[in-house]
A protein has these predicted regions:
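Residues forming the ATP-binding cleft of Hanks-type serine/threonine protein kinase domains
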Residues: 72
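Vicinal oxygen chelate
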Residues: 2, 11, 33-35, 56, ...
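Eukaryotic phosphotyrosine signaling hubs
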Residues: 6-8, 87-91
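A cross-kingdom feature marking solvent-exposed beta-strand/loop segments within repeated
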Residues: 38-42, 75-79, 120
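Non-DNA-binding regulatory cores of transcription-related proteins
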Residues: 79-86
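Core segments of cupin and vicinal oxygen chelate
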Residues: 12-63, 108, 127-128
Length: 146
């Protein structure tokens, strides 16, 4: 037995449509959206009487996928958004072709860089933004060398 590939990353959100809009405008593609409930999902996630709306998004190259859950029952447990130095998984990163354009899109959704854009060794321009539902998103533009 061996892992073949990473299939997706799940993010629980408080406003599914707002999060879909944010990521689709940044360039992800919506694969599907719909309700999920029943014994099979209760068995998988270990929560009884669960009902949720789910969406699956993919990157344009088809190699990365985000699964988004908005819990209808039971209510999602709201926590403080993670900070970059919190232990555990807390951000999703995307390569973008133009970080300034990506930041304009993020701004239309009320999202701003945590501290600004930095250049790493003339290789990348990088920033973290706090997206909808408190999702920490890293945007990275690879700098072209000529």
């Amino acid at each position: 037995m061996a892992i073949m590939r990473m299939d997706n990353v799940l993010i629980v959100v408080d406003d599914l449509d707002a999060v879909i809009s944010f990521f689709v405008e940044l360039g992800m593609e919506l694969e599907g959206k719909g309700p999920i409930e029943g014994r099979w999902v209760e068995r998988v996630i270990g929560i009884d009487d669960v009902r949720q709306d789910v969406a699956m998004l993919r990157t344009p190259d088809g190699h990365g996928r985000l699964e988004l859950f908005e819990y209808l029952h039971p209510d999602a447990i709201e926590t403080e958004p993670t900070r970059p130095n919190d232990i555990g998984m807390h951000r999703v990163a995307f390569s973008v072709d133009d970080i300034d354009d990506a930041l304009e899109i993020a701004a239309r959704h009320g999202c701003r860089p945590l501290r600004g854009v930095a250049t790493y060794e003339d290789i990348y321009k990088l920033t973290y933004v706090r997206g909808p539902s408190g999702i920490l998103v890293m945007l990275a533009e690879e700098l072209k060398t000529t």
